[in-house]
Design a protein with these regions (language model features):
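Residues at the starts of beta-strands that form the adenosine-phosphate
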Residues: 1, 25-27, 109
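N-terminal Rossmann NAD(P)H-binding glycine-rich loop of SDR-like oxidoreductase domains
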Residues: 2-22
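Conserved Rossmann-fold NAD(P)-dependent oxidoreductase catalytic core, especially the SDR/UDP-sugar
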Residues: 70-73, 98-112
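Conserved active-site region of classical short-chain dehydrogenase/reductase
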Residues: 93-97
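NAD(P)H-binding glycine-rich loop region in Rossmannoid oxidoreductase-like domains
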Residues: 45, 54-91
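Glycine-rich phosphate-binding loop and adjoining beta1-alpha1-beta2 segment
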Residues: 30-57
């Protein structure tokens, strides 16, 4: 299985599209918030195994550590007008660090 954070964004959804078109493509799990700016539309024509919210990532990783083969980390708050610094820190730094540590511990390729 391939895990793609930010999989509903522009780059992430194009990666999902490219990977899902490959013959024998592995299952793809997307980590993203779909309600923001109708990002769900970016995935509407692509085959996705599962979609999880970033807040549930740690639990998902612990429950699926045997099946994840690669992690593409494309998720971040990219808004230039976001004013909640704590949210930016949690989403852009803490989540990245946590994911990096998990990948290192489990020897999973981390593509950033």
């Amino acid at each position: 299985m391939i895990l793609i954070t930010g999989g509903a964004g522009f780059i992430g959804s194009n990666l999902v599209a490219a990977l899902s078109k490959k013959t024998g493509a592995p299952k793809i799990t997307v980590v993203d918030r779909l309600g923001i700016d109708d990002k769900w539309k970016n995935l509407s024509n692509h085959l996705v195994h599962q979609i999880i919210e970033p807040e549930n990532l740690d639990r998902y990783l612990s429950e699926n550590d045997e099946s994840i083969e690669y992690v593409f980390h494309l998720g971040a708050i990219s808004s230039t007008i976001e004013k909640d610094v704590d949210l930016i820190l949690r989403s852009n730094f803490n989540l990245s660090l946590s994911l990096w540590n998990w990948c290192t511990k489990h020897r999973i390729p981390f593509i950033y």
